Amino acid sequence: QLFNSDGKSSETILRGLVRYERSPSMDFEAGGEIAYNMLERDQAYSIGGVPEPLPSASVKVEETRGELFGKATWRINPKWTLESGLRLESSTISQSGDADQEKNFFFAKPRLLATWTPAANNQLRLRLERTVGQLDFGDFAASAEFADENVFGGNVNLQPESRWVAELTYEKRFWGEGIVSIGLRHDEITDAIDVIPLEGGYAAVGNIGDGTLDQLVLNVTVPTDKLGLSGGKFGFRNTWNHTEVTDPTTGEIRPISGIRASQATITFQQDITSWKLQWGGAWIPLLGQKNYRPDQISGWRGHDYYELWAEYKPTPTLSIRGQVNIWDDFNVERTEFGDRETRPIAFVENRFIDPRTFYQIRLRKTF
């Protein structure tokens, strides 16, 4: 198998912003942005020297996008702050090459953020917002992942994914830099982006319909000065995700590809000012994710990822940082189906990966 790809890309952005403070309790912000993005790619795929046709192998994708936005912040009293805003986005995406077409999109993106501070060091935030994702122009063209025997066609009908987001976060501060933060979030997803089946046995990144995301976020930072260790901070953070979307091949409910159900990280860092030194480390006990394709389900699972670093600043403008990253072995599993409709299992592949240990040294000088 041979896959050749040649291309170029460019991005130009012009942005303007104006702020106006009417009073200490109220201010306004307005502005606009104009952007031009381009990707041109020419690709070829062959098996045993015989060319194989690919959907959208050679394409040029161009986007012209404009956005107007405004925001108002009202500090009602010491306990309540209200922030509201609106973004109006209009874009035109044109394609030429193997596929010639042009699409226009318009999105109104309102945002509301209410902050309540019932007592000192306690805060409750409610956010309601519509978000629109940015497209990866590479998904309009064909691509290949030979490690998993995947060849993807391009998708000329790809359009942005949008979400209505509702998020509630409680934050408690203590001991100076100590924080406990708990967040609940729910997303209603329209035109969720995943992988869709194409004719000829190919697949492509595409929109697979509506979906949902439910999320719980916990973030804890504990200063260790009161525990007898000066300048130290212990940290724990985790995000639990539950997603649902309808699989375009089976019609069954499943998670969205690439979103990890959970990944806890435990950290510690210490600032030793007398030595002009900072050091720290991180540990991830378990990590992994799954991806869903029309012809296969793949994923990887690992445990015990470590990171250790130290940074020395002999002067305010010079720093020397060393870091080591250590991975334990992890397992990659791929289940291949013999037919997209009946989905009999053709084979299951397991690969055990022994990743390298990474060492880094960085010298930084500012002036």
Residue ranges, per PLM feature:
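Residues on the lipid-exposed face of transmembrane beta-strands in outer-membrane beta-barrel proteins
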Residues: 14-20, 68-74, 112-116, 168-172, ...
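Outer-membrane beta-barrel pore domains and translocons
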Residues: 15, 33-37, 87-91, 115, ...
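Outer-membrane beta-barrel channels and translocator barrels
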Residues: 21-25, 77-81, 117-121, 163, ...
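Face-selective signature of the C-terminal outer-membrane beta-barrel domain
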Residues: 1-101, 117, 123, 182-183, ...
